[in-house]
UniProtKB/Swiss-Prot annotation:
PANTHER family: DELTA-1-PYRROLINE-5-CARBOXYLATE SYNTHASE, GLUTAMATE SEMIALDEHYDE DEHYDROGENASE. It holds the Pfam family Aldedh. This is Gamma-glutamyl phosphate reductase. The gene is proA. One of its GO terms (molecular function) is glutamate-5-semialdehyde dehydrogenase activity. Belongs to the gamma-glutamyl phosphate reductase family. GO terms for biological process: L-proline biosynthetic process.
Length: 418
């Protein structure tokens, strides 16, 4: 078969499997997820061996340290993947939940009930844990899932998908409920994006180029999981010790993830007192600083920041820094250069914090805490499918409920329309 025919067959099988999944009880879905988790742990040596192939090829191709970190699987990360499946099993099942019910003057009872979306296509790059996380969330929400990972993780993704599918089939679920597109070139993606009769939603997770390619070529609705140009604004009433802890955590804990800090904004009234202090600390942690003229006047070791730096998602130990006149300029900067991901303000002024929350155009706005909390688990959603920077149909970290939609249910007693 041609690539087009194979992808069409995968999509058709997923559509058929989605009808089976939509009828599964919560108990059966949970048993399925627990079996998948156990299988991952049992097959950990095999997964590590397959992942080693991807890591070696990545090193030979010169992948960045951040990309290699995203790609790497070890016993600890595999155990974390399995635990994530168990956590999804423990979450409330949204399918079948009646979210609203009201009575009409003619005594009709009208409600809205959560139902699966159907078939979800997920296109991602070098993060093999997405294979397990996405499968777990989609299946718990009653959806079939078609995965297309990047070539950097092809061996890891094939191994994970095969293990999960085997566990799934052993529980009587059709194999088509979890599919992996076996092609790593763009033609496979293009064919996937044409399957509007079988796939209900596409979720791309990756770099700017991938997001643009998918958005421009898809016949299917797309929820973008765009880059994370995350900001922290140190306001004039900020507690410096608190600001230090938050900035260090947001920038250095895991710089290669989308909720890491990329741009630091500092109110001019505290710049002279705070910048030398934070610049010294970050420099000692090997963070490269790129600042505007006012920032560099107080931190001469910083490199000049260009216009491109304000838009940059570095995913490395690099931080763009700017001194702003006031809260207005901080908000304007974020709304101009941000990517609708996560922004934080450090302040002791409740009113200014509330204004920041209201006026910043972002899917997650944080007060006096790290941007690293923009994560489904950290926010109490359980595992997430990603962080949506698209306002329709979901905005911010996407959990189980965001993988469902609603349908109207109407109860009558013989009513007819007059």
């Amino acid at each position: 078969m041609t690539i087009a025919e194979q992808v069409a067959q995968i999509a058709h099988e997923a559509r058929q499997a989605s009808f089976v999944l939509s009828r599964l009880s919560t108990r059966v879905k949970n048993e399925l997820l627990l079996a998948m988790a156990e299988a991952l742990e049992q097959q950990a040596p095999h997964l590590i061996a397959e992942n080693a192939k991807d890591l070696e090829e990545g090193k030979q191709k010169g992948l960045s340290s951040a990309m290699l970190d995203r790609l790497m699987l070890d016993a600890k990360r595999i155990s974390a993947m399995a635990d994530a499946l168990r956590e999804v099993a423990a979450l409330p099942d949204p399918v079948g939940e009646v979210t609203k019910m009201w009575k009409r003057p003619n005594n009709l009872m009208v409600g809205k009930m959560r139902i699966p979306l159907g078939v979800i296509g997920i296109i991602f790059e070098a993060r093999p844990n997405v294979t397990a996380d996405a499968a777990a969330l989609c299946l718990k929400a009653g959806n079939a899932v078609i995965l297309r990972g990047g070539k950097e993780a092809i061996n890891s993704n094939r191994a994970i998908a095969a293990i999960l599918r085997e566990a799934m089939v052993s529980k009587g679920v059709p194999a088509g409920a979890l599919a992996l597109i076996p092609f790593t070139d763009r033609q496979g993606v293009l064919e996937m994006l044409k399957q509007e009769e079988c796939i209900d939603l596409i979720i791309p997770r990756g770099g700017e180029g991938l997001i643009r390619f998918v958005t421009e070529n898809s016949r299917i609705p797309v929820i973008k999981h765009y880059k994370g140009v995350c900001h922290i604004f140190v306001d004039e009433s900020a507690d410096f010790d608190m600001a230090e802890r938050i900035i260090i955590n947001a920038k250095t804990q895991r710089p290669g993830v989308c909720n890491a800090l990329e741009t630091l904004l500092i109110h001019e009234s505290v710049a002279a007192a705070f910048i030398p202090r934070i610049a010294s600390i970050l420099g000692g942690m090997q963070v490269e600083l790129r600042g505007d003229e006012r920032f560099r006047a107080l931190a001469p070791q910083a490199k000049p920041a260009s216009e491109e730096d304000w838009y940059a998602e570095y995913l490395e130990l690099i931080l763009a820094c700017r001194v702003v006149d006031d809260l207005d300029q901080a908000i304007d900067h974020i709304n101009r250069y941000g990517s609708l991901h996560t922004e934080s303000i450090i302040t002791s002024d409740y009113g200014r914090a509330q204004r920041f929350i209201r006026e910043v155009n972002s899917s997650c706005v944080v007060v006096n805490a790290s941007t690293r909390f923009a994560d489904g688990n950290q926010l109490g959603l359980g595992a997430e499918i990603g962080i949506s920077t698209t306002k329709l149909h979901s905005f911010g970290p996407m959990g189980l409920e965001d993988l469902t939609t609603t349908k109207f249910i109407v109860y009558g007693d013989g009513q007819v329309r007059e």
